[in-house]
Amino acid sequence: MVGGMGQEQFGTENGGSGVNDQTDWEDFPRRIKGEVFERLSKVIDPELGRSITDLGMITDIVVVPRRDTTEADYDVTVRVELTIKGCPLSQTITNQINGAVSSYPRARLHSRIDVASMSKEKLNNLVADLKAARRSNPFTKPGIKTRIFAIASGKGGVGKSSVTVNLAATLAALGYDTAAIDADIYGFSLPNLFGVDTQPTNLNGMLMPVTAWGVKLISIGMFAGSDRAILWRGPRLQRSLEQFLSDVWWGDPDVLLLDLAPGTGDMALSVAQALPNSELVVVTTPQPSASDVAVRSGLVALQVPTRVRGVVENMSWYDHQDEHLEIFGSGGGQRVSDQLTEALGYQVPLLAQLPLQPEVRTVGESGRPAVLKPDGSLDDSDLARRFVDLARTLMSATS
């Protein structure tokens, strides 16, 4: 444990509740401290993914009996030290603490939260502890549970980023701990599509990903600004990916999506080298000019240790009144699937066909994934159902 006060200091030796049938009721405030501390150990910091007690954020719990017990039996003050002043998730953490205290079953408690920020020394120790646990790229360690999908396309304009955003939002809405990296350094778009205009929190050189619509995000656009052109050569691109993987505290997500740049350039090679357990999802539209190029993006798997999980055909049709219009033709996704299956020597399925819908653009450009309602729950549209099927197929498939 880093900093903070241990469980034994709150009167719960050996992990017990500290309360039994022989409880000395005059000593009950001390017993309450122990049980409240245990309850707070289940409150998880949403950025770091660890218990606030393990992180040393709980510095004291003070329990005082009330004279007037009309509304509560005890006043409980929880003293909390957050990582930095103005922590963006301060309200989320304090709400969870209040919930843990107010739902205490053995007495009626009125909670008060005193919030401060960690000292520089304590924060340095915490960051050192977190870095020691991680050391380097966390997605290559043995036994990693995270499924990693690199979303690729042969050319731009096929809706690859829209597919990435809506797939990530769907996975998060289904309950998966979801992370996404905007690996399209020159053409970054995830911040706008997720409605993000803030920079990641910097904890002494370790970055906390920005969370939007339940998805943990990182993008060069969060640092460069939307009006700046990125002019980097290959080695700098590779270094940016390494930093996104190693210098960002991801926790242990269930799934990581990478929105690749179109084509088969430096970043595609860097992803394959840095994440050899990643799986490629190829996005195309139906017309041959897109599908023929998409095949080449999948053939990267012949030269690097990456498996192609499947193909997504985007903009497959447009429903207008009673007409089912195939604006970009038909069959492109299946052609890519067939050609990659033959070339790679294993089955590369057509995972999904997605309709062309104006809402993907209009809602997406407002900063909300089109598969979600304004409250963040999954929409009941045909598009959302297709993304749900795609998400479940990807997560259920054997890697």
Regions picked out by a protein language model, each given a short descriptive name:
Residues 18-24, 74-84, 149-151, 279-280:
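Short, hydrophobic beta-strand segments
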Residues 147-185, 298:
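Walker A/P-loop phosphate-binding motif and the immediately C-terminal alpha-helix
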Residues 171-234, 238-246:
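Phosphate-binding loop that captures ATP/GTP phosphates
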Residues 40, 58, 87, 101, ...:
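Residue-level signature of catalytic and energy-coupling elements of molecular machines
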Residues 245-249, 268-289:
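Inter-motif core of Ras-like GTPase G domains
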Residues 55, 91, 104, 108-109, ...:
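C-terminal lobe/tail of nucleotide-utilizing enzymes
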Residues 54-60, 64-72, 76, 83, ...:
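Extreme N-terminal, non-catalytic leader segments
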Residues 2-59, 63:
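N-proximal, solvent-exposed amphipathic alpha-helical segments enriched in charged/polar residues
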